Amino acid sequence: VIYPGRFHPFHRGHMASYDWLTKKFGENNVYIATTNVQAPITSPFSYSDKVMMMTKLGVPASHIANVKNPYQSKEITSNLSDDEKSKTVLVFALSAKDAERFNFAPKKDGTPGYLQLLPVDRKGVQPMTKHGYIAITPTINFKINGVDANSASEIRRMYIKGNDHDKNQIIADLYGQPDPALRDILDKKLGITEQAQNYLKEARQLDAAKVVAWMQRVLILEQQANSITTDFAHLKPDYIDEKNYNR
């Protein structure tokens, strides 16, 4: 079971989903997949930053993987032998919000795509050489600094706007207690995010050529961070058994 995401930052809602998955599928079978791709506005945290956040909440470091594309996670599946792949069911875990972005339409010839929704009773599931499955995790509502916050972007916004006390409380609400190391990471990385946002707001008052050059660099980084494939419809992993693919 692979729980993919960018996690900027990894928060209590993500941890609740991870806990739900471990109870449903077993802790030894669940892995979190994320990347080291960074961009100043939407993806400020490095892979090591996210590992620190996850392990603070109790995720075993051995079950966190640095991958090129979380929604394929070949770095995880490639560790299995051909025999293991023919006997292992592959499940990607997504929130209902994320699942809405995916296209599960049949292939052009009308046959089912590789990925299917996981049956509730799990009856008739096929190994990863034939199909992969999507499990929808429940949405968990929680409060940060006394305010509803159920998305990473909302948490970033709250932290940037908060005062010193607010920031310590946000960290305590996210990770159980104030943490100097996490405070340092959030201050540095979200400080860059705040600076980037302010530059965009003040662009008219700055030298046009410098603004254009800076914005081009930012946009390139943002495009790279957001270019991760999120359409599973025609995914064709290299471990598919061609003879049995459509059966």
What label would you give each PLM region?
Residues 1-201:
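Nucleotidyltransferase catalytic core that binds NTPs
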Residues 28-30, 57, 62-65, 209-210, ...:
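Residue-level marker of intrinsically disordered, low-complexity segments enriched
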Residues 235, 244-247:
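Acidic, low-complexity, intrinsically disordered interaction modules
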Residues 11, 72, 151, 207, ...:
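A diffuse structural propensity rather than consistent per-protein peaks
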Residues 95, 188, 192-208, 213-215, ...:
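Proteolytic processing junctions in secreted/extracellular precursors
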